[in-house]
C-alpha cells in the first residue's frame, strides 16, 4: 500500500492544511488520492451520503480534504469522530453513525474496537486509492498515550507509513519541537519519521536556512520544505482554535456578532458571511460586544441546555432580548435555534443523566418546542427559503414542534426579525445568503460565490504546497517508504 502520515509537533500546527494541500497537489498529477484521519475530536462535522443512501457524519476537515483530493467524501476517511459534550464526556461516531459515548476516565476500555475499525477503514481506502494521505492528531510524542494510539504512530506502524512532522514556526521554538518530537519516540517509531515541514514562516528565508541545515544534520532527516504564512488562506476549521472572525476590507461595514458558546459546533456556518465585503464577522462572549451588532448569530452547540445556562449566567440572554426588541435580526442555527424557543425537553438524557427528565425554559423568542430523541438525524435537506432555493445538512437529536405563530423557515421557524433553522450550511448557498442579507440588513447582492471561493482557497493551498514543498520526493516517499538508514535519536521513549 502507498501512503503518508502527516503528523505535527502540536495541535493546530497545520496538519489539516498540509494534508489538504498534498491531496490537491497529488490530484493535479493524476494520482488517485484519499485523505484519512483515524480519529478526530471536533464538534465541526459534516454529513455526506453513505453507501445505502442515508446520511453519515465525518469531521469537517476530512470532508474538505476529500474536496481537495477531487474525490467523494465517505465515512472511511474519518472512521472515529469524538464530539465533546463536556470536559470529561464525548459522543462517539463510528463509521459515520452514532456509537455511544465515552468518559475520559473510561476511554481505554472501548478503544480497541475503535482502533480495529479505524485500521480496517484505512486498509479499505488503501486498496482503492493510489495514495492515502493520513493526518495525525495532536502530537505523536504524547508518550502517555502510546499504548493505545491508533491515529499517529500506531497507525504508521499498522500500515508501515512514512511520516513527516509539521511544525508551526510562527509560535516559536519549532527546532526544539522537531527534535523533541522525534527523540521522544520509540526506536520503531523513529524509523518511520522521514523528515519535517516548516509551516507559517514569515521573513527572510536566508535567515532560516542555517537552522534547517542544522536540523537535518542533528536529526539525520531532511526538511521537505517551508510553507509561508499566507493572509488569504482559510479552510473550514476543524476545532475551536480558529474562532477569530473576519474583518471587511472597507469602511462602513455592518457588524455580525456570533455568540461564542462554550460547546460551539459547526461554526463554519458563518464562514460564508466572512466573504461578504460589507460585513464584519466577530465572535463574542461578552454581552457588551453585542450592543452595536447589526445581526447576531446564535450558532450550533453540542450541549444546548448547558450552553443556554451559560448564556443566562453571563447576561447574554438579556442582550439578545434587547437586540430583538430594537427590531434587529437574530439567527439561531440548530442548538442556537432550539434556545430561541419556549421550552427544551430531554426525557432520554441525551444531554444529561439517563432516565432523568430534564426540561428547561427557552428564551421565548420563537413559538417552538424542542424534545431530544435517542435517534440522531443525519440528512442533506433541500427546499426553499425566502423565495429562493436552499440546501444544507442536519445533525441533531432535537425534534421541533412549531406553534401557531411560527412561520416555517428552513426546517425551523421565523417570527419577524427572529430566524431559526435546523439546517447547517444554508448560508453557503449564494441565493439564500443574498436573500437573507437583503431581508435582514437591506444589503444588495455582492456577487460572492462561496463554492468558488472555497475552490480558490484549495487551489491556493495546492499552489503553495507545489511551490514550497518537494512534492515529488513526498510522493516517492509515500510509494517506497522511509530509507532504512534513519538514525536513532536518544533518549527515545521506553
From Swiss-Prot:
Pathway this chain belongs to: Cofactor biosynthesis; adenosylcobalamin biosynthesis
Domain of life: Bacteria
Presence of keyword Nucleotide-binding: no
One GO MF term: ABC-type vitamin B12 transporter activity
Keywords recorded for this protein, A-Z: Cobalamin biosynthesis, Glutamine amidotransferase
PROSITE patterns in the cross-refs: GATASE_COBBQ
Segments forming a coiled coil: none
Catalytic residues of the enzyme: 334 (nucleophile), 424
Gene Ontology BP, a term: cobalamin biosynthetic process
Domain spans labelled GATase cobBQ-type: 253-432
NCBIfam families in alphabetical order: cobQ (TIGR00313), PRK00784.1 (NF001989)
HAMAP family: CobQ
PANTHER family reported for this sequence: COBYRIC ACID SYNTHASE, DETHIOBIOTIN SYNTHETASE
Protein family (similarity comment): Belongs to the CobB/CobQ family. CobQ subfamily.
Protein role: Catalyzes amidations at positions B, D, E, and G on adenosylcobyrinic A,C-diamide. NH(2) groups are provided by glutamine, and one molecule of ATP is hydrogenolyzed for each amidation.
Annotated protein name in UniProt: Cobyric acid synthase
Organism: Mycobacterium tuberculosis (strain ATCC 25177 / H37Ra)
Protein's gene: cobQ
Amino acid at each position: 500500500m502507498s501512503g503518508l502520515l502527516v503528523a505535527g509537533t502540536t495541535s493546530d500546527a497545520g496538519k489539516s492544511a498540509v494534508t489538504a494541500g498534498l491531496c490537491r497537489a497529488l490530484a493535479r498529477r493524476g494520482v488517485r488520492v484519499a485523505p484519512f484521519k483515524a480519529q478526530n475530536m471536533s464538534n465541526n462535522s459534516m454529513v455526506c451520503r453513505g453507501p445505502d443512501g442515508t446520511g453519515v457524519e465525518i469531521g469537517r476537515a476530512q470532508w474538505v480534504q476529500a474536496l481537495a483530493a477531487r474525490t467523494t467524501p465517505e465515512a472511511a476517511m474519518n472512521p472515529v469522530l469524538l464530539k465533546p459534550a463536556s470536559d470529561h464526556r464525548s459522543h462517539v461516531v463510528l463509521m459515520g453513525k452514532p456509537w455511544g459515548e465515552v468518559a475520559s476516565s473510561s476511554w481505554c476500555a472501548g478503544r480497541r474496537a475503535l482502533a480495529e475499525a479505524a485500521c480496517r477503514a484505512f486498509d479499505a481506502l488503501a486498496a482503492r486509492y493510489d495514495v492515502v494521505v493520513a493526518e495525525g492528531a495532536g502530537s505523536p510524542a504524547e508518550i502517555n498515550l502510546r499504548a493505545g494510539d491508533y491515529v499517529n504512530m500506531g497507525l504508521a506502524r499498522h500500515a508501515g507509513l512514512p511520516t513527516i512532522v509539521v511544525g508551526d514556526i510562527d509560535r516559536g521554538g519549532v527546532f526544539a519541537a522537531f527534535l523533541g518530537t522525534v527523540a521522544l519516540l520509540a526506536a520503531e517509531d523513529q524509523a518511520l519519521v522521514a523528515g519535517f515541514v516548516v509551516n507559517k514562516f514569515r521573513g527572510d528565508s536566508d535567515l532560516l536556512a542555517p537552522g534547517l541545515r542544522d536540523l537535518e544534520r542533528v536529526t539525520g532527516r531532511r526538511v521537505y520544505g517551508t510553507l509561508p504564512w499566507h493572509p488569504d488562506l482559510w479552510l473550514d476549521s476543524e476545532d475551536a482554535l480558529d474562532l477569530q472572525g473576519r474583518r471587511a476590507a472597507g469602511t462602513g461595514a455592518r457588524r455580525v456578532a456570533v455568540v461564542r458558546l462554550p460547546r460551539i459546533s459547526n461554526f463554519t456556518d458563518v464562514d460564508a458571511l466572512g466573504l461578504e465585503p460589507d460585513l464584519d464577522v466577530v465572535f463574542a462572549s461578552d454581552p457588551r460586544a453585542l450592543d452595536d451588532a447589526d445581526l447576531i448569530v446564535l450558532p450550533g452547540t453540542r450541549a444546548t441546555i448547558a450552553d443556554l445556562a451559560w448564556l443566562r449566567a453571563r447576561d447574554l440572554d438579556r442582550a439578545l432580548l434587547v437586540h430583538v426588541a430594537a427590531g434587529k435580526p437574530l439567527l439561531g442555527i440548530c442548538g442556537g435555534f432550539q434556545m430561541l424557543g419556549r421550552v427544551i425537553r430531554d426525557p432520554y438524557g441525551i444531554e444529561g443523566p439517563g432516565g432523568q427528565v430534564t426540561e428547561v425554559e427557552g428564551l421565548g423568542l420563537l413559538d417552538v418546542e424542542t424534545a431530544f430523541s435517542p435517534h440522531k438525524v443525519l440528512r442533506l435537506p433541500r427546499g426553499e427559503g425566502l423565495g429562493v432555493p436552499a440546501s444544507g445538512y442536519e445533525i441533531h437529536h432535537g425534534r421541533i414542534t412549531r406553534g401557531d405563530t411560527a412561520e416555517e423557515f428552513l426546517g425551523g421557524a421565523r417570527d419577524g426579525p427572529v430566524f431559526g433553522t435546523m439546517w447547517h450550511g444554508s448560508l453557503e448557498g449564494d441565493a439564500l445568503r443574498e436573500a437573507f442579507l437583503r431581508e435582514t440588513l437591506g444589503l444588495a447582492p455582492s456577487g460572492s460565490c462561496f463554492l468558488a471561493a472555497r475552490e480558490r482557497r484549495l487551489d491556493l493551498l495546492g499552489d503553495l504546497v507545489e511551490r514550497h514543498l518537494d512534492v515529488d520526493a513526498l510522493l516517492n516517499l509515500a510509494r517506497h517508504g522511509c530509507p532504512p538508514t534513519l538514525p536513532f535519536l536518544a533518549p527515545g521513549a521506553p
